[in-house]
């Protein structure tokens, strides 16, 4: 029997970043079916879009995304993601992610299809691998996180099964 405050299943960017945030509030057990770097994040190339420098604005980024989405995007979700992106980029940097920089120390931003401004942060053409590397390093160092590699989540017994109050985060 194993008890934990937070159970994270999967070791991609979402699982690892959640584990790091949750570890500030309790013990985290992270379960992954293979090695931690065996995930889709590790293979992502391109980069991450974020309003970083003027003349870019949240409004321009939201507009570009909605235009490219051709009516298939939820405008509220687009606005939330665009406005939170700089904060989440700061988290990735704090956890050790190294994005490419220009000789003067500014982030080297790319511009790709559908974007009217340079707003794509990247690490060479291996952005996902760099993010995964930094997150894994931070997770392995954190005293409140236990990692179980080569494990499967099959039968989970929660407080709900015991007839007690359970919350979802």
Please place each PLM-identified region on the residue numbering:
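Core beta-strand elements of the Rossmann-like FAD/NAD(P) dinucleotide-binding domain
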Residues: 2-4
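N-terminal Rossmann-like FAD-binding beta1-loop-alpha1 element of flavoenzymes
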Residues: 6-30
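Conserved N-terminal/central alpha/beta ligand/cofactor-binding core
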Residues: 32-169
């Amino acid at each position: 029997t194993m008890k934990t405050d937070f159970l994270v299943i999967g070791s991609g960017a979402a699982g690892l970043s959640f584990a790091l945030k949750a570890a500030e509030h309790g013990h985290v057990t992270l379960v992954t079916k293979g090695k931690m770097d065996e995930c889709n994040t590790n293979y992502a190339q391109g980069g991450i879009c974020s309003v970083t420098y003027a003349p870019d604005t949240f409004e321009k980024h939201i507009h570009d995304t909605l235009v490219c989405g051709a009516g298939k995007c939820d405008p509220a979700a687009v606005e939330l993601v665009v406005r939170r992106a700089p904060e989440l980029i700061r988290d990735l940097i704090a956890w050790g992610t190294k994005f490419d920089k220009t000789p003067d120390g500014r982030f080297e931003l790319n511009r790709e299809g559908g974007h009217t401004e340079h707003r794509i942060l990247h690490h060479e053409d291996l952005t996902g691998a760099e993010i995964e590397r930094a997150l894994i390093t931070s997770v392995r160092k954190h005293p409140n996180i236990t990692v179980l590699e080569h494990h499967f989540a099959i039968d989970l017994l929660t407080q709900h099964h015991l007839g007690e109050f359970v919350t979802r985060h």
